[in-house]
Amino acid sequence: MKENNKFNFVLHRENFLTPEQCDELIRKFEESKPQKSGVAGTYEGGEINEKVRKVQEVRLQNDVVLSDGFKLTKHITMACEMANLINFNFDLEKPYQLEDIVLLRYENTDKYDWHLDIGKNETSVRKISAIIQLSDEQDYEGGDFEFSIANDEGDDNYFGTRKRGSLILFPAFLGHRVRPVTKGVRYSIVTWILGDAFR
């Protein structure tokens, strides 16, 4: 059996996006027609269940290019490829395939309770989850991104970074949640690298 001695559950990359790029993506959200996000795992697009998930979303087409020429889709894919090569070591075929990029807006008690990004049906092919923080951490209260693993100090759960422009990568099978936003607005991106189901 081959071991993976470099594995970490959660990877952070600060300054993945500039503040200007974050602002542009927030504007894209506000200029679009957001919809309520469903709970994934059905081919019908996800059941709306606000007891579990309450957030607005805008789905972007693939190959998202920002006004400064930054190829968002390409850079997320490259970051996931490097993370997989160095850290996760999942069985993924090249070229890596990315699911839709989804812009999210959490406000006024919006949340997403404990869940996995992988499940049945269309979510069964998710391998690596990617989150980008678009809001400044001073712009909202609550809304912490929390994982169901202990941190280095042995505390019960581990929190993702709140720093603006940061990329967070983790396996789709890792439990996580977004705590309710109690003040202000939290914008973020979520997407997934896809591959054959884990075996």
Q: What are the functions of these language-model segments?
A:
Residues 70-73, 77, 81-199:
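Catalytic core of non-heme Fe(II) oxygenases with the double-stranded beta-helix
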Residues 2-95:
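Non-heme Fe(II)/2-oxoglutarate
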